Amino acid sequence: MGNCEGFNRRAFLGSVAVGVGSSAILTSNAQGQENKGQENASAKPEQTQQFVASYPILQNVTETSASIAWALNTPSTGWVEWGTTPALGKIARNSEFGLNPFEEDFLSARISGLAPNTKYYYRTATAAFSYRTAYDKSATEPQYSDVYSFTTCGPNAKSGSFFVMNDTHNTIPTIREHVKLADELKPDFILWNGDLCSFYMDAQHIKENIANPTNSPYAAERPIIFVPGNHDRRGSWARNLKKCLTTWEQDDPKFYSLGYNYAFRQGPIAAILLDTGEDKPDWHPAWSEMANYEPYRELQTAWLMKALERPEIKSAPYIVAFCHIPLYDKNPKANPGNILDRWASFQWPCCQMWSPLFEKYGVQLAVAAHQHRFSYAEPTKDRSWAQIVGGGPEMANACSIYCYADENEMKLTCTKLDDKSELGSWTYKPRV
């Protein structure tokens, strides 16, 4: 992890923290029997401290909702102000069990009740918050981000597009080059297809490599969609990744634990997000009995069947599935992911469960990663769907995947990141 670049907070926060009071402190000291005699106690946070450690990260935009997360430098509370004009006017908070949020490293909020294919504006608000006792607490004036905008997705959009980067493994120069190319192509969303980092040991690692890898608002208006990779499950902080990369809201509580599985429409494209889990079986000694993916994949299969039956998915001209570990490998000796030897080249257990559903419902393309080398597999008589696999973390083998679709065709292009040469392009006709 030594190749992670340091975070220049001074330069960054000079541009992101606006509307900050210089000395005002908002103090809440509720009256009650327990706090008598404590009214003058002080627990004031330092007002001159910069509380925000990243620009907003727009994520998981659907027809009716969106989520925003941002990183912190100090324990804080916060919210998102939003509306259909830059004047905003509404507030979203990530409240739970009657309590507004109070976090040390990341804040997030989900905006709901939105309309499809509609432009919205938002900004984040962050106030450092401190407790001395249960009733003696104080907050600073909020720090506000700039006002940003996004457009909800929906089936009525005339076109749809996406950009895929994968296996960045905390290689910040590669991430920045991906983002630079995405800025030129202007896709509807960026899909980060797993192995964002090699492992996760603390919040700072996530802040540097995911929340703010470019020292710019790279995901403030173009949403990031996260598909987990096997390395995204490793390390003591892996279970906290959802603080920064928020999970989707599931319609059926039975599938609540499938936080990163989702299906949505962006114009003519139906996107299916799947989680292939780890690259070794649950009983592999490397996991020390900490892996439990077999029932997780079975639950995903039940979810996938329901997702593909949804009218807006079933009627899509194009259906694209995204997963980190490939579901197919042309090498008959490739590691299938269910043996003790080394690590999986592809995920045969997932393929056995999901490929029949791909066949039945007409999934045309699986977008995968993991192998650190580009490949494309055309459909065959035994497999009706194509598969593209992205490259690796180093510039020499990194590549980006871009897709644009309208009512006539869906075109997929893969580009080498170092010299921008084209590795190939493929077109797909509407399935319905």
Regions found by a protein language model. Name each.
Residues I111-P116:
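Short, flexible loop/turn segments at beta-strand junctions in immunoglobulin-like
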Residues Y404-V432:
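A short C-terminal boundary segment appended to hydrolase-like catalytic domains
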Residues V164-N166, I190-D195, I224-N230, V320-C323, ...:
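Active-site neighborhood of phospho(di)ester-bond hydrolases with catalytic His/Asp-centered motifs
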Residues I57, Y121-T151, Q204-K314, D341-S345, ...:
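Extended active-site neighborhood of metal-dependent phosphoesterases/phosphodiesterases
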Residues C197, P311-P332:
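Short acidic, glycine-rich surface-loop motifs adjacent to enzyme active sites
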Residues L26-S67:
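C-terminal segment of N-terminal export signals and the immediately downstream linker at the start
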